[in-house]
Amino acid sequence: MDTQYTPTYNRLWNREFTLLTIAELLLCISCYMTIPLLPFRLTTEDHASSYLACLTIVAFIIGVCISGFFGSWLIQNYRRNKVFFISAICLGATILGLSAFEFREQPIVREIEEYTLLAVCFASGAVFGTAKRVLSCTLLIDKTESCHRTDANYTAIWISRLTVIVGPILALLLRDELRGSLFYIVGAAMSLASAVLVMCVKFPFRAPEEGVHLVSIDRFFLPRGATIALVIALITAALGIMMTTRMTVEFCASVMAGFVVAALALHIPAVKNARFASAVGNALAIIAILAMFAHDDVFDATLKPTLFGFGIALSSSEQLYKLLNSCDHCQRSTAESTYFLSSDGGLFLGIAAGWQLTTAVKSAEQVALALLVVATIICSLNVLLKKKQAKHHA
């Protein structure tokens, strides 16, 4: 039986943290390699209309959002690792269930089948949201010493950020190689593997808190970070639109290269602590989109998306820092959950909008450009207002 003793580690990367990190990686890849490309796979063989295919993404993100209201109650009334285990297993089952709708002899025409498809996507979002929050916002933090928890938060977020690109790259590479339901079996297997890895880590028993409500925003959403969450959603929505309209391995790999460069640049204190880092990042992403508008050339699949990815990662990282700094120490899990909600919410809504506008690529990219402009304005206003308040209280 587990005891209340928690081992002390002098460094962040130990055996248990590494296992949980790998589990996070597998969980996110299992989702991001199957869900974002679901509209494409459904519409390619005329199994669903483009409108219905986009609704599957909307249903997924609604499931992610609604599941957050019950997260605090679940982890207070049941063992946290078992909540994750069951959620990850259910995610694998729903991923397998999606294959039944894609590979059919006849298109989906009956209304009951449309509702069933949307219900499966909603369930996928609900169990993924629960699993992701429990793992990155609770289990990873539980196995981390207090002095390392900020780094643990950043690690979890950066893993999610990279898998947003790694997942679609794997899907594009395996799409032609894995025919039929085998593609979904790979995604489900990754989800199952993440569940097994988490169960290999022992967690101390924690007595449940009293007075926990069934529906609550505790460990789900940070109200004081609503403006920051809006900016994050706008930024990631632009990313989702651009990924959808230019869904190639070369483009996604270049965006990921930009993410990696941003991760390295953020180790420089001058970059990490820059007051207008988010506005600068958005400006770089805007420049990249404008360069794509200007003319098509060899840099459209290399340099331009790398600059775009660098700007997006720089801006969203700055918003993460602001979100964590705006919360109390005991609210870090809530702040990270807020980031996850806004980041994935914006990303998948952008993907849905992008698939709906695939026949009008320029219009879709103009929408992405407008979203980044609005995000830049909000970022700049927030910085100026904060500076004005600091002078007023000085």
PLM features per residue range, with description:
Residues L25, V109-A131, D300-S315:
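Hydrophobic core of transmembrane alpha-helices in multi-pass small-molecule transporters
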Residues Y5-I61, R224-S254:
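Helix-loop boundary and gating motifs at the non-cytosolic
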Residues C327-K362:
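A late C-terminal transmembrane helix in Major Facilitator Superfamily
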Residues V120-I159:
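Cytoplasmic helix-loop-helix junction between adjacent transmembrane helices
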Residues L182-C200, E365-K386:
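Symmetry-related core transmembrane helices of the 12-TM Major Facilitator Superfamily/SLC fold
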Residues H148-A171, F340-I351:
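Glycine-rich segments within core transmembrane alpha-helices of 12-TM secondary carriers
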Residues I89-R110, A283-D296:
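C-terminal ends and interior cores of transmembrane alpha-helices
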